[in-house]
Amino acid sequence: MKIHEYQGKQLFARYGVPVPKGEPAFQASEVAPIADRLIAQTGNPVVVVKAQIHAGGRGKGGGVKVAKGGSAEATALAEKILGMQLVTKQTGPEGQKVRRLYIEQGLDIARELYFAMLVDRERRRIAVIASTEGGMDIEEVAHSTPEKIYKLFIDPVLGLAPYQGRQLAIALGLTAKETQRQFLKLVASLYACFTAEDCSLLEINPLVVTGAGDVFALDAKVSFDDNAEFRHADWNGMRDVDEEDPVELQAKRAGLSYVSLDGDIGCLVNGAGLAMATMDIILHYGGKPANFLDVGGGASQEQVKTAFQIILRSERVRGIFVNIFGGIMRCDVVAAGVIAAAKELGLKVPLVVRLEGTNVEAGRKLLDESGLTIQSASSMADGAQKIVAATRGGKAGA
């Protein structure tokens, strides 16, 4: 789950991470009072108007503007940004509509750095990544000047060691005593935030050093681990459904695990491991999966029908492969759901079904007697070849 920059900064502030003063705005009419308050509090006539979307690269896309002419200029900029379709490298060509703004005090920036924490699954550690090249696309930095990226890994038992923070400060050229002290405190606070809030990503680009030597998080990109949602009741209040995939939201509400992909073969599977294996075997035989969809071990007939509705919301889907291994899940329940969905939705794309396990014979009988054009598969490989052939004009690769 992602949150907006202003929400990330509110979270940072709770953990003692220094952030510039700022307030969110949802209408252009709210901007002038906010700008006036910031100018009065800081004595600085410069404020920054920032589009709030769940994507990076907002500045290059025209979503971040500096107002040096007080609240009137800030309001004029807000009117241009609010409602715009902001296109960045992370939104795709369709862009994302701007519905929220963050109005923030201007700072005297001397240096821009990059800082991030994320889960390194291979090492089973929290990885800290930093660079002297803040404000830039970190992927470009990694490609062109990898020597400017510094990494360290935090032992999950020992936690963040003080020497690691000092090593990072030295690598980033933060040698001034007070600046280094602030940086070490910031790193410790961010680590506390990352672990306590069950983050999967915490990124600040840029992390700035002001002319006075103070350190501030000028950006805040935060993602939470969805698996920890059960112990964070406050997450619901931070969720912005306008920024989320409506199909994935529908799946979540139905108790289904769904991720949209860019292929054209819909997949309906029970179990995450089997779902991934199904996608792999479709690719092996020359097809491209349109989604990851795990209906779980005890899905009802209604959930199976909802799963079909979700798959068919994508106009790219040219065929569907149902791959079920029934343990707790009963094959006859799946078959009944498949039949109900196909009839109700007027299914027009090829459908291949492979059933194994509990009540498999009853399930196959239901499919055979349904009167629908459903291809039965004897194995996962057989099913993958059949659906690829059906969507590729009768040919499947080996």
UniProtKB/Swiss-Prot annotation:
Binds 1 Mg(2+) ion per subunit. One of its GO terms (biological process) is tricarboxylic acid cycle. The keyword Metal-binding applies. It is an enzyme of class 6 (ligase). It holds the Pfam family ATP-grasp_2. Its cofactor is Mg(2+). It catalyses: succinate + ATP + CoA = succinyl-CoA + ADP + phosphate; GTP + succinate + CoA = succinyl-CoA + GDP + phosphate. Its EC number is 6.2.1.5. Mg(2+) binds at residues 205, 219. NCBIfam families: PRK00696.1, sucCoAbeta. Heterotetramer of two alpha and two beta subunits. Belongs to the succinate/malate CoA ligase beta subunit family. Succinyl-CoA synthetase functions in the citric acid cycle (TCA), coupling the hydrolysis of succinyl-CoA to the synthesis of either ATP or GTP and thus represents the only step of substrate-level phosphorylation in the TCA. The beta subunit provides nucleotide specificity of the enzyme and binds the substrate succinate, while the binding sites for coenzyme A and phosphate are found in the alpha subunit. This is Succinate--CoA ligase [ADP-forming] subunit beta.
